[in-house]
Amino acid sequence: FEGNFIMAGVKFWPEMSQLDKDFLELASHFQQVVPIFTNVIFDTSQPHANTVFEDMFDWLDMVLEIARENRDTLFVIRAHPDETRVRKASRETVEGWATSREVQKEANIVFVSPRETLSSYELIQRSKFVMIYNSTIGLEASIMGAAVLCAGKARFTQYPTVFFPQTIDEVRRKMK
């Protein structure tokens, strides 16, 4: 998989980094890896996505709670690379959320900054399942054969290619 592409005049990821040996060593100490792909809060799809949770950060709070209950799973929270795009940077960021929640103190959580070019596709290939809010990488993960748990309504959640529970309790049950 290659990450060298242009969309809406923005060049994304001229190089995509493979999972390094430190990550692979860390992951080897867990039963499974679950990547969590976020969105940018300014994305025009966000207001329409919030049918189960108040917003993406409400969902991330629940993800953090579940991660703390499941120490045998490595959760990899991947901030959207567009989060820090020049002239579009979010005021409210996943990186800010991660800092305020001190996720770096959790042994079973890895936070991937929006500035890191870590391959999301390699994460998907190593995953037990993939969690998204409503990012289109969920559709890509589904095409790659991964089970995808969506927490927000997306352009593809009406098709039987992903899991899209309709209540917070159902999302919580599917996560376990």
What kind of feature is each model-predicted range?
Residues 1-54:
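A nucleotide-sugar donor-handling region in carbohydrate enzymes
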Residues 41-51, 76-85, 110, 122:
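Glycine- and acidic
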